[in-house]
């Protein structure tokens, strides 16, 4: 029996185009000014020091850091330092009302229904926990943060690595066979399945004929009793 659901964000709860067409450009436009003008802010200074360690350049100046961050964005690298800095920038954007977090139409109602059924809900995304909380806290369906028990990002490991799902299961405190992971990416689901989890692939756009995972086009098409068989 499924007792907890862990969901991805991009392509799963939210249109990937919101992330790539709204969030990423917004952060990119403000990265340089954030690094140059706010490097004395303790929160930002901590991120920049972590970035220096990531680059193995403890004395890297602002220009070097900015160049590295832009390169990471170009490569879509899952850099924890980049994700943390993006989260700080997006926080201001959400609070200023520059945008709202996008959710597919059925997502909020289905998440609420699962919670009412006694399921615990979690998020696992390559975006920072801060960015996850912001997207769901300032979503186009309102503040959904009360629905979630916890959030996980790449600090537990990469999403295509099996050990990441073992770490999450341990943090949640449930055996893998009671956990369901939702994602649009087959390779992430492969890793979760290898760790003993149940899986469901969200097919929001093009079909994935290679996948061996159960598939659904919408959250309200996910039949939880199937996973008890």
Swiss-Prot record:
Binds 1 Mg(2+) ion per subunit. Keywords: Amino-acid biosynthesis, Hydrolase, Magnesium, Metal-binding, Methionine biosynthesis. It catalyses: 5-methylsulfanyl-2,3-dioxopentyl phosphate + H2O = 1,2-dihydroxy-5-(methylsulfanyl)pent-1-en-3-one + phosphate. Pfam families: Hydrolase. SUPFAM superfamilies: HAD-like. Its EC number is 3.1.3.77. GO terms for biological process: L-methionine salvage from methylthioadenosine. Bifunctional enzyme that catalyzes the enolization of 2,3-diketo-5-methylthiopentyl-1-phosphate (DK-MTP-1-P) into the intermediate 2-hydroxy-3-keto-5-methylthiopentenyl-1-phosphate (HK-MTPenyl-1-P), which is then dephosphorylated to form the acireductone 1,2-dihydroxy-3-keto-5-methylthiopentene (DHK-MTPene). This is Enolase-phosphatase E1. It comes from Pectobacterium atrosepticum (strain SCRI 1043 / ATCC BAA-672). The gene is mtnC.
